[in-house]
């Protein structure tokens, strides 16, 4: 099973995990690292490293960050030297739900691709969806 570590500004990681588990049920091998404005960056880097070690079952680990280029993302990227670690920036709930569903039976690269696609697919303007009947070109106008 692919491990997941959410690394975000503020408490967002904890709230996203709670929302994901509300949708798909309790998840194993998931950890969160919340980065506050006054946190010591090296302490948070160590926290990320420990979380990777804790959730890694040998199938890889995805570090999910809130915004590419931000401190959480930069810290996560610094962990990519480690084999089997991927970073996916711009985390949202559809991305997490998809990753939770595929991480037991897909290899790391395929799981990341599925999660990224789901994250993009469900970004939508309600007025556009209601007028066109399409959710980002899917034609079904429906959810996941």
Regions found by a protein language model. Name each.
Residues 1-144:
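N-terminal loops that bind phosphate or other acidic moieties
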């Amino acid at each position: 099973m692919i491990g997941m570590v959410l690394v975000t500004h503020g408490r967002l990681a904890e709230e996203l995990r709670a929302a994901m588990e509300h949708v798909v049920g309790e998840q194993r091998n998931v950890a969160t690292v919340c980065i506050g404005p006054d946190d010591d960056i090296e302490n948070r880097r160590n926290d990320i490293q420990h979380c990777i070690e804790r959730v890694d079952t040998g199938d890889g680990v995805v570090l999910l960050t809130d915004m590419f280029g931000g401190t959480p993302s930069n810290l996560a990227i610094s962990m990519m030297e480690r084999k089997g670690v991927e970073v996916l920036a711009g985390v949202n709930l559809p991305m997490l739900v998809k990753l939770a569903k595929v991480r037991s039976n897909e290899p790391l690269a395929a799981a990341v691709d599925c999660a990224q696609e789901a994250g993009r697919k469900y970004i939508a303007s309600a007025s556009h969806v209601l007028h066109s009947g399409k959710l980002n070109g899917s034609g079904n106008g429906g959810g996941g």
